Amino acid sequence: MPELSQNLVFIGGGHSHAIALNLWGKQPLADVNVTLISNVRHTPYSGMLPGYIAGFYCFEEVHIDLEPLAKFARSRFVLDRAVGLDLDNRRVICGDRPPIPFDVVSIDIGSTPATIATPGAADYAIPAKPVPQLLHHWSELLDRVQAEPNRRWRLAVVGGGAGGVELILSMQARLWRLLPPGDRAALEFHLFQRGCELLPSHNPYVRTTLTRLLGDRGIHLHLGETVSGLTREGGAIALQCASGFCVACDRVFWVTQASAPEWIARSGLATDAAGFILVGDTLQSLSHPEVFATGDIATMQNHPRPKAGVFAVRQGPPLDRNLRLFLQNRPPQPFRPQTQFLTLIGTGTGRAIASRGAFGCGPNRLLWRWKDRIDRKFMQTFR
């Protein structure tokens, strides 16, 4: 009697899933029906997004087209949002279509900056994630600046980690190239960091170098300032800090601590205090072994790491391996993520700074060319 086929469902087109689907296409398992659910067809590669913002890459160069990737993996592609899990009946609840059954499900949907706790942020701030929303607002801003080159533009970024620093440097560099030198004085940039140090997770060399670079480029750095609210005042956004400091802005970009969608915790999966899925060393949910999770949406209980794209990329191959083992009723193998990792932070001007543990160097063009080569090589695997 032939074995019944099994249903493997991927929720989200994040880095880990893109890698796993690519590997699956090269060596598919028989009698497994694969489905990819994503609310977007084109998924961004986070490593190249600052370069895209800065104008070094086009849209196609920094996005993976999920439809042909799913086809290569012999998978069904469903363009829809997952809004819940029925774990008792093993079904994915979708926004616009009937539930999709699964025997095994993997979740890699990223995260969004936590804006809910700050009054007005959900209404007036532009979160760095979801990325398609960020890129829509960025494209609209570029059009407005080109249409009104003599107007004063005041832009703020909230969040002084690597993501916020790289974003504001990339935005400034792109807008500078867009405008004649005489009009650049109309651009005003502010970076807000709650702590008293920029890039607190990086070494002193990187912190000092980037703090100096922001100053050299005329970006106003506000350390020790907690943004307490955003309000609309006339045609501007009033950014208010707990200290009483206030700045009028035209756009506010939000690049702060990550948060998880509420449906994850509502589903009944074990989560950490922030609502991210708790997984073990095999990338399986601690409460439901038929559920795997990777990337920002997952927290490895024994090896907590920052919410960074490098970890999602590294989780791709072990996720593929363990999904195969689980589907074959074999024990999945543990995965231990690296404790230190190399970060290459772009300045928006064709230079980059390297940071790894206590090591730091740059900025220089050689590091940017190295970063560009690494990123292009990664994206080439999906062409």
Residue ranges with predicted function:
Residues 123-149, 246-314, 321:
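FAD-site-proximal beta/loop scaffold in flavoenzymes
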Residues 2-76, 166-201:
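Beta1-alpha1 glycine-rich phosphate/pyrophosphate-binding loop at the start
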Residues 77-80, 84, 173-280:
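A Rossmann-like FAD-binding core segment of flavoenzymes
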Residues 4, 349-383:
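C-terminal auxiliary extensions adjacent to catalytic cores
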Residues 297-347:
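A conserved FAD-binding loop/helix module that cradles the flavin
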Residues 13, 109-110, 256-257:
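Glycine-rich, N-terminal phosphate-binding loop of Rossmann-like dinucleotide-binding domains
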Residues 1-5, 74-156, 253:
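FAD-binding core/adjacent interface of flavoenzyme oxidoreductases
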Residues 138-186:
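Rossmann-like NAD(P)H-binding beta-loop-alpha module
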